[in-house]
Amino acid sequence: MAIRWTPHPSLAFTEFRGIAMTGFAPCVAAAFDGPIDIIGDVHGEYDALRALLVQLGYDDEGRHPEGRRLVFIGDLCDRGPDSPAVVEWVMAAVAAGRAQCLLGNHELLLLVGESRESLRWFIDPSHAELQPGGKYAHCRVVPPERKAAYLAFFDSLPLVLERPDLRLVHAAWWPAAIDALRAAGTPGNLALYEAATQRIETQLEVRGITQREAEERSEHADQLKDGQGNPPLLPALAEANLRRNLDNAVRVLTFGPDCLATRPYYVMERWRMAERDRWWERYTDDVPVVMGHYWRKFETSPGTAAPSMPPSFDPTLGPSAWLGPKRNIYCVDFSVGARFVERSRGQTQFRTHLGALRWPECQLVIETGVVVATEPGFVSG
């Protein structure tokens, strides 16, 4: 079955900063009722998405014969071959009421105008690395006339979806951030992010951290500029990083919370002084949480680790495992975002996968058709 995409200019748009956009949904919104299929981080892997939808029983318009509906956990786009096709398909499915989609950190990076090589398919389509022979020559670039619609769509996405039996978020169920968003109304993700950024930067300036951070960056400029620099742990830079993460509700829900690193490490083109806080180890609520973001492995035998940042989970955890003291948190990101690395090595048999968690069945389905009965610490309907 062919699942195709086409632009959907007929969506109902309003105006925001001169950009046509869909109306804003609440930041904390109600999840679909009934049976749903929660799809992990797609990262521009359109063929994997197409294969997974077939395995789940959806037609090319996102309809299911049993009335099931889709929820995308975020990170639609990245270094996969066809981020535009993924975004277009999801936009259409959301507009038709057949899917919901959360904001992921990769969509947030595009919204706030970050300049990273992994975003060049969108921010700099003419870059040499996107041309034949370049590092990202495999990536289809965004059609220029669709940029505004993509940004508008990302700006309108909820950050949290919830219902009585389930919570959905891209990276972290962080109560302080969620409470703040409940009170925020519907200003849009970019406006929320910018307001938090302005408040945080003012506080850092007042505390003198901004000046100390600048001094550390200047003193260690050569070490910070590339992945081989091995800078020391810089206290002002670390504190600034933590505040920009933990005090910004949009960021902490899409990137996950940070804590002070034991030593600096280099990932996503920069040195980090903070590392991931394993928040799931302290989650004691009864309501299950499904998230993405954390580059989980599907295979656990030696030599099958997906290329990624430092591992977030016990590397021996298999795909059936739930996390947390009550075993009621599930990460549905099975590292398909690293498939571009596998291709660069000439691999055609992939160890990274795109998965979906079927709710309430608690079954994992991956794009190859493998079905895994997961093992939650609760009884699901």
Task: Spell out what each predicted region is.
Residues P35-H43, L166-A172, Y330-V332:
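Active-site-proximal beta-strand elements of phosphoester/diester hydrolases
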Residues I38, L70-F72, C101-L102, R167, ...:
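Residue-level marker for buried hydrophobic side chains located in beta-strands
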Residues P187-G381:
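Acidic, His/Gly-rich catalytic cores of divalent-metal-dependent hydrolytic chemistry
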